[in-house]
A protein has these predicted regions:
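N-terminal beta-strand-loop-alpha-helix module at the start
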Residues: 1-64
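Short phosphate-binding loop-to-helix
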Residues: 71-93
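Short Gly/Thr/Asp-enriched flexible loops that form oxyanion-binding sites at enzyme active sites
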Residues: 105-119
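General beta-strand structural signal in soluble alpha/beta enzymes
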Residues: 6, 29-32, 72-73, 129-132
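Long, charged alpha-helical interface segments
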Residues: 140-216
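Class I SAM-dependent methyltransferase SAM-binding "motif I" and its flanking Rossmann-like core
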Residues: 120-148
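A glycine-rich helix N-cap at a beta->alpha junction
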Residues: 67-75, 125-129, 154-162
Length: 216
């Protein structure tokens, strides 16, 4: 079982609508005021999570309760973001694959925390992918293959999440890598804006890397 989490950041509505249409069996979790985004495309979530401090209309919660939507309400004073609590709710149902929309909004603190959440859950076997109009962001461990026709846009970039990672090989790309260290401090931008030139890329490396597929 997979899940789609919709948070309160910037969302390309048509992108979200198309993704939901293509993944009709996925559990849909709305975070706080993101329900207003789902209402624009006439989608009723399975679960609503949050402190609902940004949802001023109390009648809206009652409406969805009457539609048998599970409401998970948290205290506004808490140690976790609403987005992280939504992921926890999905994991509670043993969901291992989660797509997140709206994670990259106006506030960088929330966006950065959402990116760090990817690695936290990767460590327990949960794959989370953040989508927006221009980016697809996820964490990979040790090895992966990506076909060029499945690339989100034109570019692919890699960032260390562990201070440094050893890249044994990155092949099938415009700028191949062999037996090099990826440092997140000394060379933070060295491995950005690569391109797949063959039918697929293959990467072998140590630990976890943040992978960003992007387009202009």
């Amino acid at each position: 079982m997979n899940a789609i989490i919709v948070t309160g950041g910037d969302i390309d509505i048509s992108l979200l609508e198309n993704y939901i249409a293509e993944n009709k069996e996925d559990v849909i979790i709305s975070v706080d005021a993101a329900i207003t985004k789902l209402e624009k495309i006439n989608v009723i979530p399975n679960i609503m999570v949050g402190d609902f401090d940004t949802l001023s209309d109390g009648e809206k919660l009652k409406k969805y309760e009457n539609l048998n939507v599970e409401i998970v309400k948290h205290d506004p004073i808490k140690d976790f973001s609403d987005s992280e609590l939504a992921v926890d709710r999905a994991v509670k149902d043993d969901i291992k694959n989660i797509a997140v929309f709206g994670a990259l909004g106006k506030r960088f603190d929330h966006a950065f925390a959402n990116i760090l959440i990817l690695q936290k859950y990767k460590k327990i076997g949960v794959d989370i992918t953040i989508y927006d109009k221009y980016n697809k962001i996820y964490v990979k461990s040790n090895h992966f293959i990506l076909e060029r026709e499945k690339l989100w846009g034109k570019y692919i970039s890699f960032f260390s999440l562990e201070g440094k990672n050893f890249m044994e090989k990155l092949e099938g790309v415009k700028y191949p890598i062999e037996n090099k260290i990826i440092y997140n401090i000394a060379t933070p931008s060295l491995y950005i804006s690569n391109e797949i030139k063959d039918d697929k890329l293959e990467a072998k490396f140590s630990g976890d890397l943040l992978v960003v597929e992007s387009r202009d």
